[in-house]
């Protein structure tokens, strides 16, 4: 009995007997989330250390977006000039876009970069509620942007963009070309700028700053086709901020890619073909169409902002 009691006394006291000591030990052995966040922040490189990654990512995004559009332009021009009845350019471009999307999403060589490519593309599926609010916010913004565009062309003198009259070609060619034209710019821009580039920026700075930088970088790309005019660049800046906000809040480019494609299809068919007919208000006065566009732009801007607020709430709720 004495031997047993002696052994019991030689054992180290348990932490249950000293709760304060156990709590201190727990705090020292498992750093708090705040401390881990601070340590992660301290490990981040300085601003000059971040620049190379940002520069390379931005350059890649710009080349990919502009280059993809250039490839489509060459294919389409050749197709319409040689055999407009057979829309072979659409098939070739579809294969190119599929290959691009697969590679950016992590397929094929090199395997060592597969996970990184998949992560940076950010083509993640979303819960139905988050996806629905993201699409709603994007579509409401698109309607507002249509109104602002119509108002802009009647307030500021801007050289109008002359588009090919696709409806003068065979119906099948016209329909397929318009659909592909809407997909080319949207998929390339969303993958490169709202996927790779914005994802890189978000790791190194706040979300709003990252959205603005990404929108500023793509502006010259839009100006290559629309002209280097400040009203046009400002309009495109806000449209790019819209898509950037969708990608930032959802951490996915799927909603913005869908809305971007729908928006381009609307502009290709209902807006841009009629730009040449719009006259400045100081020449003809503000007609009914002008006021409808102006009021619609304001109303749908408010609705879009409310939808984005709701999107931010539902997106935050799904995070663990």
Regions found by a protein language model. Give the residues of each.
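C-terminal membrane module of polytopic membrane proteins
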Residues: 261-320
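Alpha-helical transmembrane segments in multi-pass membrane proteins
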Residues: 54-115, 133-134, 295-298
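Hydrophobic alpha-helical transmembrane segments
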Residues: 55, 59, 131-136, 175-179, ...
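Membrane-interface helix caps and helix-loop-helix hairpins in membrane proteins
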Residues: 222-230
């Amino acid at each position: 009995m004495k031997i047993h009691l002696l052994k019991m006394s030689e054992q180290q006291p348990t932490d249950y007997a000293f709760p304060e000591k156990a709590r201190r030990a727990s705090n020292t052995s498992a750093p708090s989330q705040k401390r881990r966040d601070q340590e992660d922040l301290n490990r981040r490189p300085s601003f000059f250390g971040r620049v190379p990654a940002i520069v390379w990512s931005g350059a890649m995004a710009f080349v990919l977006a502009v280059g993809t559009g250039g490839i489509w332009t060459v294919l389409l021009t050749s197709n319409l000039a040689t055999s407009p009845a057979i829309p072979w350019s659409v098939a070739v471009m579809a294969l190119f876009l599929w290959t691009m999307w697969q590679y950016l999403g992590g397929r094929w060589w090199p395997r060592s970069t597969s996970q990184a490519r998949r992560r940076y593309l950010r083509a993640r599926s979303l819960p139905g509620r988050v996806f629905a609010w993201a699409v709603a916010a994007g579509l409401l913004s698109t309607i507002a942007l249509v109104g602002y565009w119509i108002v802009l062309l009647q307030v500021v003198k801007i050289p109008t963009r002359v588009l090919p009259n696709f409806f003068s070609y065979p119906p099948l060619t016209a329909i397929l070309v318009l659909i592909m034209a809407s997909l080319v710019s949207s998929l390339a821009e969303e993958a490169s700028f709202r996927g790779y580039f914005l994802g890189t920026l978000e790791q190194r700075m706040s979300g709003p700053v990252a959205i603005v930088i990404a929108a500023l970088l793509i502006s010259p790309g839009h100006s290559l086709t629309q002209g280097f005019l400040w009203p046009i660049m400002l309009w495109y800046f806000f449209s790019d901020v819209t898509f950037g906000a969708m990608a930032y809040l959802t951490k996915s480019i799927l909603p913005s890619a869908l809305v971007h494609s729908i928006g381009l299809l609307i502009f290709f068919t209902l807006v841009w073909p009629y730009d040449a007919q719009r006259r400045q208000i100081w020449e003809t006065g503000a007609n009914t169409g002008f006021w409808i566009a102006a009021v619609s732009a304001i109303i749908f801007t408010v609705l879009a902002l409310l939808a984005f607020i709701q999107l931010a709430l539902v997106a935050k709720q799904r995070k663990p």
